[in-house]
A protein has these predicted regions:
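Short, intrinsically disordered, charge-balanced linker/junction segments flanking boundaries
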Residues: 13, 124-129
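Small/flexible residues
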Residues: 24-25, 83, 129
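Short, surface-exposed beta-strand-loop junctions and turns on beta-sheet-rich folds
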Residues: 26-28, 35-36, 127
Length: 129
């Protein structure tokens, strides 16, 4: 038996930096489940905003990226997770505070330079490396 989960999220960029969230002691990209009747574009923007505190009006989708697929077994059932990804530019004030959504288990949000990515990816999920 298998079940399918669809999610949507973004690689958020600003000033040559990428935004990551910290959840379950790992760095990850902001994303969330697609709700019935809501498209993947809108879901990506809403989830980024909810998880980081950035205003939806300051999030500009630049490009749709290739979706990823992730399979895992839970209690004998296979779960297939498809994530729609977007390249998103943050056009707001770079010094605006980031507010992690603690209700979702997010403990930190932080901008990282491309040079710092090696260190960040060491503490991330294998599927985003």
């Amino acid at each position: 038996m298998s079940s399918k989960i669809k999610t949507s999220g973004g690689i958020v960029i600003k000033n040559d930096k990428i935004l990551f969230i910290r959840k379950n002691n790992r760095w990850d990209l902001p994303k969330g489940k697609l709700e019935e009747g809501v498209n993947s574009r809108d879901t990506a923007i809403v989830e980024i905003s909810e998880e980081t505190g950035l205003n939806t009006k300051d999030l500009l989708i630049l490009k749709k990226l290739i979706p990823t697929h992730y399979h895992k077994k839970v209690e004998g059932a296979t779960i297939v997770k498809k994530t729609y990804w977007y390249l998103v530019e943050y056009i707001g004030d770079f010094n605006s505070p980031l507010v992690p959504d603690k209700n979702e288990g997010i403990t930190d949000c932080r901008w990282f330079s491309f040079d710092e990515l090696v260190l960040v990816l060491e503490e991330s999920h294998e599927r985003i490396r």
